[in-house]
C-alpha cells in the first residue's frame, strides 16, 4: 500500500467447507501478519489493489459463476462493502483473473488506472481480454479493452507494468501453455 503496508489476497475454507476470499496484511515488513473478515462467501482466487490511499479493492472469482465479485475495505478487511461493479461489470465463467492498480505518475496517460485480465465470457475459457478502467473499476469501456486470444485455453493470467508505456501479461493461451505479451 502507499503507506508501506504489505497486503496479500487470501482464500480459506471454514467448517461449512465453503471457500472465502479476504486479505492478510503486515505493517512491520512481514514479521507479523493479521487477517480479519472475508469479503464474500463462496469466492476464491482474489486479486487486491489499492484504489485510493488506504482503500483496497478485492476482485474475486465467484464460484456462483457469471461474473466477478468485487468488494472494498477501508479498514484492512475488518469491514467490507460491495463495490457497485460487483457481479455486473466483469463477465466470467468461474476462473482466476489478474488486477493491478497503476498510479498516474507511473503511466504515460497520467491517469490512475485499474488494469484487469480474464476470459471475457460467462461460459468456457476463451476470449482472454485486457481491460482498463479510468474510474476506479466502476466501468470497463469497450474502447479500453483488447482481445488477446479468442481460442479455448485455461484462462489464468498475470499482469504487470513493464514501464510507463508497456503492460506485460503472462497467460495460459490457446497456442501455448504460457504466452508472454508486451502491449
Name what the model sees in each region:
Residues 1-25, 29, 33:
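Aromatic- and glycine-enriched pocket-lining scaffold segments that form the walls
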Residues 88-94, 140-162:
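Conserved blade-ending motifs and adjacent loop-strand segments that build the rim/top face
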